[in-house]
Amino acid sequence: MAPLPTESAPVPAGSAPPSGNPAARSLPVVEISGTPLERGRQYGEAVRPLLHASLAYYEEAFGRSAGLTWEKVTARAARWLAPVTAYAPHLVEEMRGIADGAGADLLDVLALNARGEVIYDKSFAEITADRAGRPPEEEPAEGCTSFAAYGPASGDGHVYAGQNWDWRAGVADTVVMIRIVQPPRPTLIMQVEAGQVGRQGANSAGIAFNANGLGGRFDDRIGLPQTVVRRTVLDQGNIADALDVLCRTRAHIASNALLTCREGFAIDLETTPAGHGWMYPTDGLLVHGNHYQAGVPAPLAAAGYRPMSPDSLVRVPRAEQGLAALRHSTGPAESRELIRRAMSDHLGHPESLCTHPDPRRPAVEHWTTLVSSLADLTTGEYLVTAGTPCDRAYQHLPWNLYDGPHGGPEATGTHP
């Protein structure tokens, strides 16, 4: 399926971004299929230079922030090999294939999939404490602002889900859009850092998964990495099974999960190792950021909780205000522009809803909106911006969500 002529065209993974205007850049696209090992090898071969660029960046970032060598980081990541193998052996096989295809070590790929867990691991904080025994200052949670809009919040009657994915600018050129064909499981479309097996996206069953880091350190019992949990959620064929994964799985770190389905339903779960909180939309609109909105977990409240990303307190209401205009939309084209405009808000710049690098910080600590995504769960179209949405048009991906298992007659809307 070719991209619409009015949209940015996709480029193969591993290609250099276009020179000149950065707004003309498109995200690389990768499609994989076959057995888990075959899928992994296809993926690794396609993103080989991007994966090695990501490894180089995180080696520098961990070295600068914690004084750790990459060997120590992978040694920490090895803690997750056994639990992931027990929970999802097919994903370990996929990671093994990625490593083979990219010419990397399995623990390198595992570290990329557990980078958040390494950062927020309680024992990691202890081994990186200074000589006085003080742990390092907790890093801000992975920044994102997610939304779901349907029913009275959507003037054209479509079901929308998406987010601004804010993370370190140094990995911007390692982000790819991946389509995973894995029957009988649903086909997935996700935005990921090269080598990751899961992050955020949507599937052919009409389920969208958007996520936000929440921060806070809990106990040091081993839980599953977010990439594995999120991939498992998107592997489900209905909303109840997707929720079941989140409620029955103990993740290692806290993360917010916003689930939206094509039937016109959404629920938000603030998942933590200590328990979950949940929220429902108000009049069809739900927005979540990087602070606890359903309730602060008791262990964090007892310790005097303060949001690790104070700008989230601004981003959430600004997104709500901007997306309120969607209820008056008369058609999908207008809706998409209203959403892009809402997600381009700059109040509090540079740490705004549309995030830009802060020139006051060292380059390795620069944050930016890596991708602004929009899934139309009514039509199955998936749109993204390759960077900040304020100065870019949506890139129309060359796939439809409903070209896969569970995407047949029960899907709402029509396929383009």
Feature annotation, model-predicted:
Residues 2-143, 235-276, 282-416:
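C-terminus-biased signal that marks the final domain/tail of proteins
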Residues 229-235:
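Short, well-ordered beta-strand elements within core beta-sheets of diverse protein domains
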Residues 115-228, 370, 382-384, 391-392:
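Internal mixed beta-strand/loop scaffold within catalytic domains of large alpha/beta enzymes
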